[in-house]
Amino acid sequence: MPGVPPYYDWIAHHAQRRPRQLAIDDLQTGRKFTYAELDRRTNRLAGALAARGLGKGDRVALLAPNCAEYFELQFACGRLGAIMLPLNWRLTVPELEYILDDATPKLLIHDKSFGQQAAALARARLEIDVESRESGYEQALSAAPPPPAPAALTHDDIGMVMYTSGTTGHPKGAIITHGMVFWNAVNLGIPAMISPTTVQLVILPLFHTGGLNCYANPVLHAGGAILIMRAFEPGLALDYLSDPALGITHFFGVPAPYQFMMQHPKFQGADLSRLVISGVGGAPCALSILETWTARGVPLVQGWGMTETSPAGTMLDGADAVRKVGSAGRPMMHTEIRIVDEDGKDVAQ
């Protein structure tokens, strides 16, 4: 229907219904975007990409620290049917070269801080400089023609490719469809009590599924706000969590940030009373971390998932975190899980 946003484009949906609502606060740069502003920038980026010949099925790589541009690119690609390729900025140039040769993106968008690596990769590129309106990225947005009509997509169309490493060999590209991101938003949104009033502090790398999808995309799906840390620093994170003006209600991390924060001098005096849900995943969480945060009134909600499932699979309620140490929790609402023996046969319940 004309004027109705496609189901996968919740930025456009909220821009129509709550245009003045804060969508993203890029904390260290001071940039804030309402849903209306994020929608306009996303549209301009879609137009800029289309003007460069990108369309359905084409890949666009992004090499950047945490920033709002991750979400601009994700939804701009969605409007074109293109595919986002977030790159791990911790990789060496040869490692990045392998991924780019394998995924064959038509364009590399990179932060100014990775200019040397981007030049060595010798690809068509646009540079982001969050401190300047004269960067190639911002100029491309300013000069962008109107984008084409939104691509007709289904849940099975690819939205992004995320390279993930196993124990051996080169990283392999995990195919992430629009449906996977949508169902993850639903699966996590309900038990994590995510709503339009949710405010999440995002600290995990956005090139990783944990940063993008726990809980950032579910929060944007609900019409809430995400506050992005460019890089995690425990004392600063505790300051943000304590700030009543920010009103942070949700937090997600792997165990290490929780350990770093609880070992920081500011931890005992931090005001954590506004936290509704604090999730932890990505690795087993030590009992000492669970007990310390529970004693501060913040029981950690544990989860299990993997990049290939985008990512949520199971969740263990905070009330059971200490009692059931070592458990991965129960399957999410729209998730089916089998437990099998070494022969692949279902075990008894």
Stretches with model-predicted labels:
Residues R59, P65-L85, W89-V93, D101-L107, ...:
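A short helix-loop-beta submotif of the ANL/AMP-binding
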Residues S113-H155:
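ANL superfamily adenylate-forming
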Residues A64, L85-Y98, K112-F114, G224-P244:
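ATP-dependent adenylate-forming carboxylate-activation enzymes
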Residues A192, H221, I248-G253, M262-R323, ...:
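Gly/Ser/Thr-rich phosphate-binding loop
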Residues F182-V199, F207-T249, Q259-F260, H264:
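Conserved AMP-binding/adenylation subdomain of ANL enzymes
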Residues K32-A36, G159-W183:
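Conserved AMP-binding A3 loop
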Residues R20, A144-Y163, H170, M193-V199:
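Conserved pre-ATP/AMP-binding loop-to-beta segment of ANL
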Residues A23-C67, F71-F75, T92-E97:
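Conserved AMP-binding/adenylate-forming core of the ANL superfamily
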